[in-house]
Amino acid sequence: MNRQSLFILTGLSGSGKSTAMEAFEDAGYYCVDNMPIELLPKFLDLPLDSDTDINGFAFVMDIRAKQFLSQFPSVLESLGKNGHIPEIIFLEADENILLKRYSQTRRHHPAGQDKSLIESIKSEKSLMLPIRKISKRIIDTSNYNVHQLKAEIRNIAHHHALKPVSMKINLLSFGFKYGIPTDADLVVDMRFLSNPFFVPELKALNGRTKEVKDFVLETIQAKTFLKKYLGLLDYLIPLYTLEGKAYLTIAVGCTGGRHRSVAIAENIFEHLSQRGFEPGIIHRDIDRDTKEL
């Protein structure tokens, strides 16, 4: 396993470790929360398929596991001898912030037992000090919201990923007469283009055929639209990726979802494919109007 692909997320309870783990998961990492420290070496020695689709590993470890503090130094040494050099990320926050977060969630603090909440927070902070000292990265999340923390962790995850992380893009053609897709992020209406449905020799065909594509795409209106819209997508997609958006569904509609929307969606698909993406495409209503032909 690549040495840069192993992370241990640790730190104070309430500092955002679960949020950090979600960011690693979104970046294609295999993640385990509350991993028993004694099982880590055995887990990392398990064989992986050569074609496994994993960018790396991220394990959340903290005082919830009874043996964590006592065994962590020896396990870390053992990992190093076997070629596994984890990057330790220590998350923390101001005591007042942790107190506020726990008060809002009403969860029990793992260092609680018979102590008050503030005493538990102080106790954990003291217990975790040796781990903090050996951590490569210390992130204070006091002034972070969820999105800001995910963005910082995502930058770390992407930098060490074994392969580039890209957003999943799906194209969906549809007919407005059958309803707008509820899961669409972007919806564009092609009903301003001339409708092949009213051309006798094109009526029975669909937007995947050369005849319909030529009819739809060769108009000045379609060419102007595609120039502007494809430029907009080229601008938006990197920004969506930067914000951590994992999926983008682009819905292209016309009246029945058989001709214009299909031809335009196919053109957008080709453009995104040429840009290095691997978009999916579904023509939801392409066969819905066949009984009316």
UniProtKB/Swiss-Prot annotation:
Keywords: ATP-binding, GTP-binding, Nucleotide-binding. Displays ATPase and GTPase activities. Pfam families: PapZ_C, RapZ-like_N. GO terms for molecular function: ATP binding; GTP binding. This is Nucleotide-binding protein HRM2_27900. SUPFAM superfamilies: P-loop containing nucleoside triphosphate hydrolases (SSF52540). Belongs to the RapZ-like family. GTP binds at D62, I63, R64, A65. ATP binds at G11, L12, S13, G14, S15, G16, K17, S18. The keyword GTP-binding applies. The keyword Protein biosynthesis does not apply. The lineage of its organism: Bacteria, Pseudomonadati, Thermodesulfobacteriota, Desulfobacteria, Desulfobacterales. It comes from Desulforapulum autotrophicum (strain ATCC 43914 / DSM 3382 / VKM B-1955 / HRM2) (Desulfobacterium autotrophicum).
